[in-house]
Amino acid sequence: MSSAIPLNVGIARSAGTATVDADTAKRVLLAEPRGYCAGVDRAVETVEKALEKHGAPIYVRKEIVHNRHVVETLRERGVVFVDDTAEVPEGAVVVFSAHGVSPAVHEAAAARNLHTIDATCPLVTKVHQEAKRFARDDYDILLIGHEGHEEVEGTAGEAPEHVQLVDGPDAVDRVRVRDENKVIWLSQTTLSVDETMETVQRLRERFPSLQDPPSDDICYATQNRQVAVKAMAPECDLVIVVGSRNSSNSVRLVEVALNAGAKAAHLVDYAREVDPAWLEGVRTIGITSGASVPEILVRGVLDMLAEHGYADVQPVTTANETLVFALPRELRTTRR
């Protein structure tokens, strides 16, 4: 999955090179890891392989991943994004996004004789399985997540009679359970680790017998990207997070950067959205990207910053990621 390695907070380009005096030179600290996680890579490749196999158009329910560039690029290749399976012609191919869907969505697709390809991230599927398991055991399930997010809707849909959404620490006082000895918390996979733990702490103060999920629900990539940002933020006058505004994990990175000591932090989809006014008086800029962001967008920001004198790019490496997920069975061939 990923492994922690010695932290290099960007003082040198690589082992053995000279150090840089941060007081006299502009520099960029580049977070590693950043960008695509295994689930996003799998989801995007699923759509690409479906196009190769079935030809355009193919349909995708919701955005395959929460990134504007990815969605626009796939749309240009013949992918049609819809909000509901009712918009898909009967018998057509439809891909379910990385965020997962409820059983009701599967049933609606079957009723329309749709050929479904499920690109749900396996780590989201794990949370679905946990929800079903604890619902069978008649637990009250407190699902920590953001109201309206597709992942939350899909997970809650696995056991709607047992799941209660808890949208952050401030929502804890509104929670009601049937039996305080049969309560478990689960979470959306893309949340802030710190805020989630604060929510859990407050839940446990109310319900001392609250059970933890069998394993972490916040995914490895979300955690790794937040750790890298925390490592570099105290040195940064500015942190730029490349990602879309509807990307939960990207938005969380901005929050994490500010909470960890960055003087300013902004979210951008493209280099052209970087306001030159942000750079005034700034010597150290941190760069990272959300888990659904292709590296070409980060490179665009780095090129733009180089034009403004930030040519010295130094890595902040906190983990190595090696996890790869298999494609859906119907699309499996040799991976590219």
Curated annotation (Swiss-Prot):
The keyword Iron applies. [4Fe-4S] cluster binds at C37, C121, C219. One of its GO terms (molecular function) is metal ion binding. It is an enzyme of class 1 (oxidoreductase). Gene3D superfamilies: 3.40.50.11270, 4-hydroxy-3-methylbut-2-enyl diphosphate reductase, catalytic domain. Binds 1 [4Fe-4S] cluster per subunit. The active site is at E151. The keyword Glycoprotein does not apply. Pathway: Isoprenoid biosynthesis; dimethylallyl diphosphate biosynthesis; dimethylallyl diphosphate from (2E)-4-hydroxy-3-methylbutenyl diphosphate: step 1/1; Isoprenoid biosynthesis; isopentenyl diphosphate biosynthesis via DXP pathway; isopentenyl diphosphate from 1-deoxy-D-xylulose 5-phosphate: step 6/6. It comes from the Bacteria. Pfam families: LYTB (PF02401). It catalyses: isopentenyl diphosphate + 2 oxidized [2Fe-2S]-[ferredoxin] + H2O = (2E)-4-hydroxy-3-methylbut-2-enyl diphosphate + 2 reduced [2Fe-2S]-[ferredoxin] + 2 H(+); dimethylallyl diphosphate + 2 oxidized [2Fe-2S]-[ferredoxin] + H2O = (2E)-4-hydroxy-3-methylbut-2-enyl diphosphate + 2 reduced [2Fe-2S]-[ferredoxin] + 2 H(+). Its EC number is 1.17.7.4. Isopentenyl diphosphate binds at H66, H99, H149, S247, S248, N249, S292. Keywords: 4Fe-4S, Iron, Iron-sulfur, Isoprene biosynthesis, Metal-binding, Oxidoreductase. Dimethylallyl diphosphate binds at H66, H99, H149, S247, S248, N249, S292. InterPro entries: LytB/IspH (IPR003451). One of its GO terms (biological process) is dimethylallyl diphosphate biosynthetic process. Its cofactor is [4Fe-4S] cluster. (2E)-4-hydroxy-3-methylbut-2-enyl diphosphate binds at H66, H99, H149, T189, S247, S248, N249, S292. Catalyzes the conversion of 1-hydroxy-2-methyl-2-(E)-butenyl 4-diphosphate (HMBPP) into a mixture of isopentenyl diphosphate (IPP) and dimethylallyl diphosphate (DMAPP). Acts in the terminal step of the DOXP/MEP pathway for isoprenoid precursor biosynthesis. Belongs to the IspH family. This is 4-hydroxy-3-methylbut-2-enyl diphosphate reductase. It comes from Nocardia farcinica (strain IFM 10152).
